[in-house]
From Swiss-Prot:
Subcellular location: Cytoplasm
Sorted UniProt keywords: Cytoplasm
Protein name: Regulator of ribonuclease activity A
UniProt organism field: Vibrio parahaemolyticus serotype O3:K6 (strain RIMD 2210633)
A GO term for molecular function: enzyme binding
Biological processes, Gene Ontology terms: regulation of RNA metabolic process
């Protein structure tokens, strides 16, 4: 399904939080949405890999990587695990790598930047904890909507049919 964050903000601005504009799209999906699972980690992607091995249908993995621009938390191998387990997307407050392969995947991936250096695998990180970046506090089980224009967050799922109806009428 396609999502338009601009149209969603036109309808739900009082009900959503808008993440500061700092993310770029690296995945093969222009837009994605779902209920979030949060991870807080710094330059270590072992918990990310472990989490993405679970069923991700209807879910988005939101990673607070501390905004690190030194090591990539997502690479093609980890993204392929997410794609295989039907995750809708990944938002990384940090970096990705192997971007040419990421853009060919049926997966939404938003991140700050890309860098060729990979992350450590030391098992350090926290799962399903509140995280804060981009001027927004993210709670596990919130709903995220992302496209090339931006990222918005809602505590409840948004009625996408309203957005689709407005688009059809125009």
């Amino acid at each position: 399904m396609e999502y338009n964050t601009s149209a969603l903000c036109d309808i739900y601005l009082d009900q959503v939080d808008v993440v500061e504009p700092m993310f770029s799209n690296f995945g093969g999906r222009a837009s994605f949405a779902g209920q979030i699972t949060t991870i807080k980690c710094f330059e270590d992607n072992s918990l990310i890999r472990e989490t993405l091995e679970q069923d991700g249908l209807g879910r988005v993995l939101l990673i607070d990587g501390g905004g690190s621009l030194r090591k990539a938390l997502i690479d093609a191998e980890i993204a392929a695990i997410a794609e295989e387990n039907e995750w809708e997307g990944i938002v990384v407050y940090g970096c990705v790598r192997e971007v040419d392969e990421l853009e060919d995947m049926n997966l939404g991936i938003q991140a700050l930047a890309s860098i060729p250096v990979g992350a450590a695998n030391q098992g350090i990180g926290e799962l399903d904890v509140p995280v804060n970046f981009g001027g927004v506090s993210f709670l596990p089980e919130d709903y995220i909507y992302a496209d090339n224009t931006g990222i918005i967050l809602s505590p409840e799922p948004l009625n996408i049919d309203l957005e689709l109806d407005d688009t059809v009428e125009e």
